[in-house]
């Protein structure tokens, strides 16, 4: 069973060092110093309370960003590159769903995923998310791409 807690500075540094290969390299983050200087993602002091780390024993397996919005709750997820396709994404999303539906019981949970990333799409579908609507174009700090919005209804 995974455990989680609010993300620490040392965990942020570790996540910045993760190195995805091939087409997944689009998910590589800038170095920690750059993230801090630009106040990006979990290095933004106004948003860092939204980020959680997930452990399997002593191993950091992933992190999430959980952000309440007007009509739903956005979740961003990252799994350690050497632990992808080992079931951690589903385990993490199970914990995220529990937290989100406890804190925001009437709001659906949603995420955005690059259309080509069928590995992630399949993981999210197994975790109870479904593609909503048509793909859309979006530019992120990691580049431009075509994305699906996937939704998990409030329980």
For every predicted segment, state its role.
Residues 1-2:
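Extreme N-terminal starter segment of soluble prokaryotic enzymes
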Residues 6-12, 17-84, 99, 103, ...:
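Acetyl-CoA-dependent GNAT
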Residues 76-78, 87, 123, 133:
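Glycine-centered small-residue hotspots that permit tight backbone geometry or close packing
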Residues 78, 91, 119:
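Short alpha-helical segment within the catalytic ATP-binding CA
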Residues 83, 87-96:
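Conserved acetyl-CoA pyrophosphate-binding loop and the N-cap/start of the following alpha-helix
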Residues 106-110, 114-121, 126-130, 134-155:
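C-terminal "cap" of GNAT-fold acetyltransferases
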